[in-house]
Amino acid sequence: MHDIKAIRDNQQAFEAAWSAKGRSGAAAEAVKLDALLRAAQTALQEAQAKRNESSKLIGMAKAKKDEAEATRLMAEVEHLKAVMASAAQTETEVGGQLRDLLASLPNIPAPEVPAGEDEAGNVEIRRWGDASKLPAGRLNNPKDHVDLGAALGGMDFEAAARMSGARFVVLKGQIARLERALGQFMLDLQTVQHGYTEVSPPLLVKDEALFGTGQLPKFKADLFKTSEQNWVERLDEQIALRVPPLLNITQTDVVENLKGLRAAASMDEQAARWLIPTAEVSLTNIVREQITDEAELPLRMTALTPSFRSEAGASGRDTRGMIRQHQFYKVELVSITTPDQSDEEHERMVGCAEAVLKALELPFRTMLLCTGDMGFGAKKTYDLEVWLPSQNTYREISSCSNCGDFQARRMDARFKKVGEKGARYVHTLNGSGLAVGRTLVAVLENYQDETGRITVPAVLVPYMGGVTHIGGEA
């Protein structure tokens, strides 16, 4: 959420930044709505002041028995009430339009972010690793993870489709164990070596949480939502069946009374919940509507959770295999910092994500995303892309973003600086450390040999109970 005063004072800068993200004209529209809103507020205040003054004069006129003046003033008061009602309506309507507009506008890119329309404008920062030194590097035609998983009897897409539909998978045996080993290894690395605090957060969240991190309202179609009324309606049915005989009343009476009670009472606890698309939502919202002491920052948190995404915008893309799933595990990294700390923390976070790939000896490259390829809430983003032999290319496996105070404003998350009376907005950062499913894909493909046997990366052997190979002698 953006500060309208900042937009008003720096309209050209905001216009240029949003134009780079495909929202040309947004700053002018926001300033126009703001002017209408302030005009309505001024009109309302002026009408209120005049009404109050006229109301006093009515009493004075009546005291002087000046009925004509009293009548005139009363008519003026009625007119002012109409003016106030109109101004109040305009304030409500325009204020809502302005809030909706501001909620829909993306973050402002940092100055060093390259201009570009899509991934073609991204800039490679560095590469690490040599794919030719891994087992798959010696193969002319490496298999993809789907064929490898099926041959090993550990990956079943058909069974998953029968129970859940497309973009799901059933992992079994040593492949399932390898996925679990990867998640545990990543979590241990980020907590023990990198100092992140492990958190076990909710997987179901309210609208406000997703608004805070920027998924709502813009990306509603990408989310899974639970049904909000099913259990309430079933409870109503049972009450309607069981209560009437006890009270000697009709079921219709009970049902009608329940409708009235539910309409009058807060439905907050029965409202729908959303499945988290990433643990970023749960972890970042821990500081929602909180004021954190500066001494506690940076606050670093990590979690290994399932993530749920509808992939509404990915129709036809990556339909084969585990690259793009509705449900997948991911180790998330979140940092809450002061504005002075966030740039350095961003670089540190990228290093923490890279450390996983280095430990697994998986070749990767680090990309700085351009303006047109960055996410909604990010002001600067690095993507890590891992080498996949079957595709002969690099694919995204982590995205690390500095969101500045963009999410903090939406969540009202602030910190108290020593020696200052007021509180400032924190900066929030998030990144994958890493996506477990895609890392599993990379391990299977890069560590395959000509027989389809998989060598377990050395750092994972302790997590695999000493197993060194999958599909052959341990």
Curated annotation (Swiss-Prot):
It catalyses: tRNA(Ser) + L-serine + ATP = L-seryl-tRNA(Ser) + AMP + diphosphate + H(+); tRNA(Sec) + L-serine + ATP = L-seryl-tRNA(Sec) + AMP + diphosphate + H(+). L-serine binds at T278, A279, E280, E332, S432. The keyword Cytoplasm applies. ATP binds at R309, S310, E311, E396, I397, S398, S399. Its main location: cytoplasm. It is an enzyme of class 6 (ligase). The keyword Nucleotide-binding applies. GO terms for biological process: selenocysteine biosynthetic process; seryl-tRNA aminoacylation. It is found in: Cytoplasm. Pathway: Aminoacyl-tRNA biosynthesis; selenocysteinyl-tRNA(Sec) biosynthesis; L-seryl-tRNA(Sec) from L-serine and tRNA(Sec): step 1/1. One of its GO terms (cellular component) is cytoplasm. GO terms for molecular function: ATP binding; serine-tRNA ligase activity. Its EC number is 6.1.1.11. Keywords: Aminoacyl-tRNA synthetase, ATP-binding, Cytoplasm, Ligase, Nucleotide-binding, Protein biosynthesis. Homodimer. The tRNA molecule binds across the dimer. Consists of two distinct domains, a catalytic core and a N-terminal extension that is involved in tRNA binding. Belongs to the class-II aminoacyl-tRNA synthetase family. Type-1 seryl-tRNA synthetase subfamily. Catalyzes the attachment of serine to tRNA(Ser). Is also able to aminoacylate tRNA(Sec) with serine, to form the misacylated tRNA L-seryl-tRNA(Sec), which will be further converted into selenocysteinyl-tRNA(Sec). This is Serine--tRNA ligase.
